[in-house]
Amino acid sequence: MRAQDHAISSVKAKLQVRRLNFYYGRTQALKNIELSIPERKITAFIGPSGCGKSTLLRTFNKMYTLYPEQRAEGEIWMDGENLLDPKQDIALLRARIGMVFQKPTPFPMSVYDNIAFGMKLFERLSGAEMDARVDGRRHPGPLWNEVKNTLRQSGICLSGGQQQRLCIARAIAIRPEVLLLDEPCSALDPISTGRIEELISELGHEYTVVIVTHNLQQAARCSDYTAYLYLGELVEFGETQQLFMKPAHQETENYITGRFG
């Protein structure tokens, strides 16, 4: 009943998940996940609370290593490297795979220093090079138009929506290969949500973006591909339009039509 191999043969895969299982202590949260995430596309993870969406997302940059009782088994490949190899440099991995969380997390420093923070950690840039990277020409228009006149203002003084867009700018400033978004709009009003969605759509042209969302309309609007998870299993994965209009599994149809969830 569950799909076993969800590779998208017509596009290049950036992340390849193979036989992935995940545990919180003795509780298994992900069960034998097989999935290929297309490069420079937007992939949405949907499903009811507790289905494993965020857990799967956080295996990509090994956020779980912060908690000793959590562990992953299997393989996640990116550009010929198994990201679950214990020899992986976690700091560099998280530079390659950026992440934005549900609640905005601006640092208590200026907008400029927020955006430059990662560059100072991972790169040796001159002041002029740093200024050029922070410059708005490096960021999507909707973001830059709001913060260009407040670079010396504290990031924590921005509105909630602006703070979240600042966190996205901070994540992409170090030029990651993949951007993970864990319910980035759940704490925002509809107008701020619309602006974030516009920004996500722009980012999808340059980055491999993976977003977890409870908002089915958001998944339908923003993503190129969608994965539906239930009870730790990957039920269905495919092009978003196809999955929403003509899902291959009854369970998927029940969820997206509101009969279940």
From Swiss-Prot:
The keyword Cell inner membrane belongs to this UniProt entry's keyword annotation: yes
A GO molecular function held by the record: ATPase-coupled phosphate ion transmembrane transporter activity
Subcellular location field: Cell inner membrane
Stretches assigned to the ABC transporter domain: 15-256
SMART domains for the chain: AAA
Keyword annotations of the record: ATP-binding, Cell inner membrane, Cell membrane, Membrane, Nucleotide-binding, Phosphate transport, Translocase, Transport
Enzyme class: translocase
Gene Ontology cellular component terms for the protein in this record: plasma membrane
Annotated residues for binding of ATP: 47-54
EC number(s) on file: 7.3.2.1
GO biological process, one term: phosphate ion transmembrane transport
Pfam families listed in its UniProt record: ABC_tran
Catalytic activity: phosphate(out) + ATP + H2O = ADP + 2 phosphate(in) + H(+)
Coiled-coil ranges from the UniProt annotation: none
InterPro entries listed in its UniProt record: AAA+_ATPase (IPR003593), ABC_transporter-like_ATP-bd (IPR003439), ABC_transporter-like_CS (IPR017871), P-loop_NTPase (IPR027417), PstB-like (IPR005670)
Bilayer topology term: Peripheral membrane protein
Subunit structure: The complex is composed of two ATP-binding proteins (PstB), two transmembrane proteins (PstC and PstA) and a solute-binding protein (PstS).
NCBIfam families: 3a0107s01c2 (TIGR00972)
Summary of the function given for this chain in its UniProt record: Part of the ABC transporter complex PstSACB involved in phosphate import. Responsible for energy coupling to the transport system.
Family statement drawn from the similarity comment of this UniProt entry: Belongs to the ABC transporter superfamily. Phosphate importer (TC 3.A.1.7) family.
UniProt protein name: Phosphate import ATP-binding protein PstB
Gene that this sequence comes from: pstB
